């Protein structure tokens, strides 16, 4: 699958039934050694779509359960803390 095919898909946490963002607004963490995607870095958002600075949710790639035609379903552990920048 190409990155362009992933772009625009909604990211949903299956445990919380919560929309986390859209892949176009998300950063990817890539292993420089082998070029594999290791994690999604999802920015936290305040009201009206304004981004809260410095806080991202880091979701390891292996937490992705399913990539569908219009969404990506994640199984995010409850204890996963936000990433500080």
Swiss-Prot record:
Claim: Cytoplasm is one of the keywords in the record: no
Pfam families in the cross-refs: PRC (PF05239)
Gene3D superfamilies listed in its UniProt record: PRC-barrel domain
Keyword set includes Lipid biosynthesis: no
Biological process per Gene Ontology, one example term: sporulation resulting in formation of a cellular spore
Signal sequence, renumbered to the chain: none
Keywords for this protein: Sporulation
Protein family membership: Belongs to the YlmC/YmxH family.
Name the UniProt record assigns to this protein: Uncharacterized protein YmxH
Gene for this chain: ymxH
């Amino acid at each position: 699958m190409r990155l362009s095919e992933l772009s625009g898909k909604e990211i949903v946490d299956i445990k919380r039934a919560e929309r986390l963002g859209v892949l176009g607004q998300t950063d990817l963490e890539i292993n420089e050694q082998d070029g594999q995607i290791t994690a999604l870095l999802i920015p936290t958002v305040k009201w009206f779509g304004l981004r809260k600075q410095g806080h991202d949710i880091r979701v390891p790639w292996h937490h992705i359960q399913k990539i569908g035609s219009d969404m990506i379903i994640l199984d995010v552990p409850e204890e996963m803390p936000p990433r500080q920048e």
